[in-house]
Amino acid sequence: MRGPELRLVLLALVLCQAPLGPAAPVSVGGGTVLAKMYPRGNHWAVGHLMGKKSTGESRHVLEGDGLKELLRDDIQWEEATRNLLGLIEAKGNSSHRSPQLKPLSTHQPTLDTEDSSNLKDVQLAKLVDYLLQGLKAKEGALS
């Protein structure tokens, strides 16, 4: 009994020791199931968002004034983020020099004589510039 015969006998012994019955192991005596089996995994919420459509406005659909306003807002958010990061870095610096003050926006929007809302935006941007410069100066004086 050598070679393939021995292998078959060992395989038969191993298979005879395997538990018979359900795929999931159960406690001795057939009590409660140790773990609930999900044949496709435990992904109960896999498809609950399938087929949903966005109800918000698409940024690519906007045209004309809406697009200009959106771009202006994006530029303002980007500049505000840069200034905030500059403040955080300046606060994290252990040096006692004051951070350089620079205007919030180096890009000055063109003024249309017909568009009074654009003038308000420019004035608001200047006001925000002055306020941020004041905050930076105060932070520089405290450190």
UniProtKB/Swiss-Prot annotation:
One of its GO terms (cellular component) is neuron projection. GO terms for molecular function: neuropeptide hormone activity. Residues 92-111 have a biased composition (Polar residues). PROSITE patterns: BOMBESIN. Residues 91-115 are annotated as: Disordered. It is found in: Secreted; Cytoplasmic vesicle, Secretory vesicle lumen; Cell projection, Neuron projection. The keyword Ion transport does not apply. Keywords: Amidation, Cell projection, Cleavage on pair of basic residues, Cytoplasmic vesicle, Mast cell degranulation, Secreted, Signal. GO terms for biological process: mast cell degranulation; negative regulation of voltage-gated potassium channel activity; negative regulation of voltage-gated sodium channel activity; neuropeptide signaling pathway; positive regulation of behavioral fear response; positive regulation of peptide hormone secretion; positive regulation of phospholipase C-activating G protein-coupled receptor signaling pathway; positive regulation of respiratory gaseous exchange. The modification Methionine amide is found at M50. Residues 54-143 form a propeptide. Residues 1-23 form the signal peptide. InterPro entries: Bombesin (IPR000874). Belongs to the bombesin/neuromedin-B/ranatensin family. Stimulates the release of gastrin and other gastrointestinal hormones. Contributes to the perception of prurient stimuli and to the transmission of itch signals in the spinal cord that promote scratching behavior. Contributes primarily to nonhistaminergic itch sensation. In one study, shown to act in the amygdala as part of an inhibitory network which inhibits memory specifically related to learned fear. This is Gastrin-releasing peptide. It comes from Cavia porcellus (Guinea pig).
